[in-house]
Amino acid sequence: MVTVEEVRKAQRAEGPATVMAIGTAVPPNCVDQATYPDYYFRITNSEHKAELKEKFQRMCDKSQIKKRYMYLNEEVLKENPNMCAYMAPSLDARQDIVVVEVPKLGKEAAVKAIKEWGQPKSKITHLVFCTTSGVDMPGADYQLTKLLGLRPSVKRLMMYQQGCFAGGTVLRLAKDLAENNKGARVLVVCSEITAVTFRGPTDTHLDSLVGQALFGDGAAAIIIGSDPIPEVEKPLFELVSAAQTILPDSEGAIDGHLREVGLTFHLLKDVPGLISKNVEKSLTEAFKPLGISDWNSLFWIAHPGGPAILDQVEAKLSLKPEKLRATRHVLSEYGNMSSACVLFILDEMRRKSKEDGLKTTGEGIEWGVLFGFGPGLTVETVVLHSVAIN
C-alpha cells in the first residue's frame, strides 16, 4: 500500500510554474482616440451637451491612448439604442452580445498561444477563464472548451466579475495548479468586451465618463506549466511568488455593479493616490525574501488602469521612465482592457526584448514584478523571473 505522503509527492511538480506561450486578439473595429469624442457624442445623441463634450475631449487627450479596439460599432449601437443612453434597461441586449463574443475572442487568443506552445491541445489539463464582461451558465469556460475542442475532462475554473486586478489573479491560480499537479498544462484566458459597460454621458457622474475614455476590448491567452519539456516547450517567464491584498481605507474606491442598465463603474478621485501610497509595501513584502530593494533593478508590468496611476507610481518609487515603457505602450495601443492588459504587456515585453537583442525576456533583466489593481481596492503582486534569450 502506498502512503498519502507518497501519493502527495508524486502529484507535485519539481520546478516553478513557467509561462510557455502567449497569444492575444482584438476585435477588427479600431477606434481612433483623437476623433472618439465626436463619434461618442454623436452616437449617443448627446451633441447638445457641449460643455460635457469638452470635458470628455480633455479626458481623451490626457488618456495617453492613441487607439482602442471595440466590438461595438455604429451598426450594433444603432440596433440597440438603449445601450447609448446613460441609464436605460439594456442588460438583455448586452448579455446577448458578450455571452457569444467573449468566448469567441478568447478562442482567437488561445489558438495563437497553443500554436506557439507547439503541443497538441489534448495535453491541456486545466482551463482558467476570466472575464468582467457578462455572466452565463454554463460559463465562458465551457463555451471555450467546446470552441477549441478541448477534452471534456479538462478541469475548468470560471472567474466572473473580478475587474482589472484579475490578470494577476489568473497567474496566481495557474501557478498553484501547475506546481501542485505534475504534468499539468494550464490554459489561461482573459477576454474582455466593453459592450457591458458602454453607455451615454451624464453631467451627474463624471466617473462613468472616465471609463468611456479608457476601456477597450481584448483577449489574451497564456499556457503555464512546470518542468518544461526540453527542446519541445520554450519557457518565457517563471512565476516565483504571488500575493493578493486589500488596500487600507480604500472601500468604494473602485466599484462595479451589474444591473438592468448593464455594468456601471464608479471611481473615487483618489484611486491613483491610494495605489501609489501602498505600492511600496507590496513590493517590499514580495522582494525582501530575494534581497531586492532597488525597484529600478526590476522589469515592470503594471496594469495600466489609467495614466494618472502610472505617473504617480513612477513618481512615488522614483522609477526611471523606461521601466514602464511596455505598460505605457499597451495603454497607448489598446486602452484599458481590464484583466487582459498585463498579459498583453508580458507579450509586448518578451517580443521587444528579443527584437532589441537583449539577454533575457525581461528587457535583459533577471527579476521582475507584475501588478494588478482593481475593485476592492485589490492589488495582485506577482514576482517573475525572466528566461535567457538564446
From Swiss-Prot:
Residues of the active site are: 164
Q: Which domain of life is it from?
A: Eukaryota
- Where is the secretion signal located? none
Q: Which Gene3D superfamilies match?
A: 3.40.47.10
pH dependence of this protein's activity: Optimum pH is 7.0.
Documented EC number(s): 2.3.1.74
Catalysed reaction per UniProt? Answer: (E)-4-coumaroyl-CoA + 3 malonyl-CoA + 3 H(+) = 2',4,4',6'-tetrahydroxychalcone + 3 CO2 + 4 CoA
Q: Does the keyword Oxidoreductase apply?
A: no
InterPro entries cross-referenced by the UniProt entry: Chalcone/stilbene_synt_C (IPR012328), Chalcone/stilbene_synt_N (IPR001099), Chalcone/stilbene_synthase_AS (IPR018088), Polyketide_synthase_type-III (IPR011141), Thiolase-like (IPR016039)
- Which biological pathway? Secondary metabolite biosynthesis; flavonoid biosynthesis
Cite the entry's keywords alphabetically. Acyltransferase, Flavonoid biosynthesis, Transferase
Pfam families reported for this sequence: Chal_sti_synt_C (PF02797), Chal_sti_synt_N (PF00195)
Q: Name one GO biological process term.
A: polyketide biosynthetic process
- How does activity fare over a range of temperatures? Optimum temperature is 35 degrees Celsius.
Any single GO molecular-function term of the entry would be: naringenin-chalcone synthase activity
Q: Hey, which family's this protein in?
A: Belongs to the thiolase-like superfamily. Chalcone/stilbene synthases family.
* Functional summary from the UniProt entry: The primary product of this enzyme is 4,2',4',6'-tetrahydroxychalcone (also termed naringenin-chalcone or chalcone) which undergoes enzyme-catalyzed or spontaneous isomerization into naringenin.
Please give the name of this protein.
Chalcone synthase
Naturally occurring in which organism (per UniProt): Hypericum androsaemum
